UniProtKB/Swiss-Prot annotation:
Binding locations of Mg(2+): 76, 95
UniProt pathway annotation: Cofactor biosynthesis; thiamine diphosphate biosynthesis; 4-methyl-5-(2-phosphoethyl)-thiazole from 5-(2-hydroxyethyl)-4-methylthiazole: step 1/1; Cofactor biosynthesis; thiamine diphosphate biosynthesis; thiamine phosphate from 4-amino-2-methyl-5-diphosphomethylpyrimidine and 4-methyl-5-(2-phosphoethyl)-thiazole: step 1/1
Record field: transmembrane: none
Binding site for 5-(2-hydroxyethyl)-4-methylthiazole: 290, 462
Cofactor note: Binds 1 Mg(2+) ion per subunit.
Catalytic activity entry: 2-[(2R,5Z)-2-carboxy-4-methylthiazol-5(2H)-ylidene]ethyl phosphate + 4-amino-2-methyl-5-(diphosphooxymethyl)pyrimidine + 2 H(+) = thiamine phosphate + CO2 + diphosphate; 2-(2-carboxy-4-methylthiazol-5-yl)ethyl phosphate + 4-amino-2-methyl-5-(diphosphooxymethyl)pyrimidine + 2 H(+) = thiamine phosphate + CO2 + diphosphate; 4-methyl-5-(2-phosphooxyethyl)-thiazole + 4-amino-2-methyl-5-(diphosphooxymethyl)pyrimidine + H(+) = thiamine phosphate + diphosphate; 5-(2-hydroxyethyl)-4-methylthiazole + ATP = 4-methyl-5-(2-phosphooxyethyl)-thiazole + ADP + H(+)
Enzyme Commission code(s) on record: 2.5.1.3, 2.7.1.50
Protein family: In the N-terminal section; belongs to the thiamine-phosphate synthase family.
SUPFAM superfamilies the record matches: Ribokinase-like, Thiamin phosphate synthase
Listed result of changing residue 370 to K: In THI6-3; possesses TMP-PPASE activity only
Phenotype when changing residue 510 to D: In THI6-1; both enzyme activities greatly decreased
This protein's name: Thiamine biosynthetic bifunctional enzyme
CDD domains listed in its UniProt record: THZ_kinase (cd01170), TMP_TenI (cd00564)
Length: 540
């Protein structure tokens, strides 16, 4: 059967591996189970097999693919593909050059190419639409199916760079499939986050091996994968993701929910912050726990209204941090991420980027320098972990906040004299191929919170970190009717107002510590946002 390029469905792309078959199954039985339940494209990948056996295997799989009207792709072996008249070939960067492959295959066959750099996209764009039909974008995450991986995992941000390059070089014809380390626990996050910066394209599909080939019940495994692709919504927290402009009434409702639910806030944070953060959390009607014990994170995450504040001011063991992120993501409990000193040192940059790649965060909160660096709008490396926005204007800070919110599908907070809060969750919605249909970072809803200068805030330790405690308390206390954006905005508004109130009462930096906790307690328990001193307005 001949498939036209336009009608190929890349959404669920199965790559075979005969070395991981469960007992009682065959390669053909696993492939057919996948095809029965939603696989849309099959690639035979065999690295250690005699040509005669490869051809025989390919012919058997081809019969099954024809039965389900699904294209068959051969990995690397152009001779095998031509011998059985397969529907196409997939090659890597070190395989036969693309122009030569196309010359051998002819114009009608599907030709795929593994791509991991924007420069490779530039090359395929120069070749034009007659060469590469689709690219495998990756490797996204670590994977055991590559015995000697030559590329480091790129994560969703690397995939975004590839999608941006396709748009920049106008390779509109080229389809994309995410490859490498994709499993049910990260597929929806990848589909949600991997959107070009101009909002005009997203991944066309995902490629998997072990989740079908190694599954004892490949039918059920494929149904689950198909369901994730078709869901079009990633509900990564148990509250509402739809945003409207916060009002005093909606913020009152948030505080009432926090007060009623008394969330448990697990702090993984720096030692300087721990005591002050615990007292701030208590002042907000919440229960703090300072725990960096890997073996208990799953239990803590499952406590009703649990919330995690992950602050990288002190570098905890990376495996413990990953375990915590995974535990909270697994049960859809919110994580507030504070990438302290994001790019201050290579160690911090590597740690923060690793964690950003590993999980989904309900809120990413940082000072001006951190958010500018995250958005790649900072021209210099941070000096230490303190904020140093200098003369950066409010338009640039808003833009940076919106970029972070857009790229990480989160509510982003940029702190300073003016606090910016942007919602990039898109209600958790995602679409294959079409991205956000042209909606970009600068289109995201963003609010500005200000209360004049409060210089004494910078004269105490952990004032910025404790805003993280406040946000984590508010979003952890939401029930299913609460709105994430309202909670984050309400937390920032309360904290700013409490800071101003405390600054009028204190005698110096020592008493400011105490007055800030008292002010937070007072404003939270009074629950009268209409009387708070900080102002809230939409940006433009």
């Amino acid at each position: 059967m001949v498939f036209t390029k336009e009608e190929v469905d890349y959404s669920l792309y199965l790559v075979t591996d005969s070395t991981m078959l469960p007992p009682g199954t065959t390669l053909c039985s696993q492939v057919e189970a996948g095809l029965k339940n939603g696989v849309t494209l099959v690639q035979i990948r065999e690295k250690d097999i005699e040509t005669k056996n490869f051809v025989a295997e390919a012919l058997e799989v081809q019969k099954i693919c024809k039965k389900y009207n699904v294209p068959l792709i051969i990995n690397d072996r152009i001779d095998v593909a031509m011998a059985i008249d397969a529907d196409g070939v997939h090659v890597g960067q070190d395989d036969m050059p693309i122009p030569m492959v196309r010359k051998l295959l002819g114009p009608s066959k599907i030709l795929g190419w593994s791509v991991g750099k924007p420069s490779e996209v530039e090359t395929l764009a120069k070749w034009g639409p007659d060469m590469v039909d689709y690219i495998g974008v990756g490797t996204l995450f670590p994977t055991s199916t590559k015995k000697n991986p030559k590329k480091s995992p790129m994560g969703p941000q690397g995939a975004i760079a590839i999608l941006d390059a396709l748009e920049e070089f106008k390779a509109t014809w080229c389809r994309t499939v995410g490859i490498g380390g994709l499993h049910p626990d990260n597929i929806q996050r990848v589909l949600c986050q991997c959107v070009a910066s101009n909002g005009k394209r997203s991944l066309d599909g995902i490629s998997l091996v072990s989740d079908i080939m190694a599954a004892p019940d490949a039918c059920a495994a494929t149904k689950r994968l198909r369901g994730l692709l078709d869901a079009t919504r990633y509900q990564f927290v148990e509250c509402e993701l739809n945003n409207t402009f916060p009002t005093t009434t909606s913020i009152q409702n948030v505080i009432s929910q926090v007060s009623n639910n008394r969330p448990l806030v697990q702090h993984i944070t720096n030692k300087v912050h721990q005591n002050f953060g615990a007292n701030v959390t208590l002042a907000l009607g919440s229960s703090p726990i300072m725990s960096e014990i890997e073996s208990e994170v799953s239990e803590l995450a499952r406590i009703p209204n649990a919330s995690l504040l992950l602050n990288t001011g002190s570098v905890a063991p990376i495996e413990m941090l990953k375990a915590a992120i995974n535990a909270y993501n697994e049960v859809n409990r919110p994580i507030t991420f504070d990438p302290v000193g994001y790019s201050a040192t290579e160690t911090r940059l590597c740690l923060n980027n690793t964690l950003l790649t590993y999980g989904q965060f309900a809120c990413i909160k940082g000072n001006c320098s951190e958010i500018l660096s995250l958005a790649k709008l900072n021209n210099h490396k941070m000096k230490g972990v303190d904020s140093s926005s200098g003369k950066t204007n409010i338009d640039t800070l808003v833009r940076a906040t919106q970029i972070v919110a857009f790229q990480y599908r989160t509510v982003a907070v940029c702190t300073g004299e003016f606090d910016c809060v942007a919602d990039g969750t898109f209600g958790g919605e995602y679409k294959l191929s079409s991205g956000t249909e042209g909606i970009t970072a600068e289109d995201l809803p963003c609010v500005i919170i200000e209360d004049g200068p409060i210089p004494i805030m910078g004269d105490i330790t952990a004032s910025g970190c404790s805003l993280g405690s406040t946000i984590a308390s508010f979003i952890g206390g939401l029930d299913s009717t609460g709105k994430l954006f309202d909670a984050v905005v309400g937390a920032v508004l309360l904290y700013k107002s409490a800071g101003k109130l405390a600054s009028t009462r204190c005698q110096g930096s020592g008493s400011f510590h105490v007055e800030l906790i008292d002010a937070l307690y007072q404003l939270f328990h009074e629950n009268k946002p209409e009387k708070w001193s900080a102002s809230l307005k939409k940006f433009k």
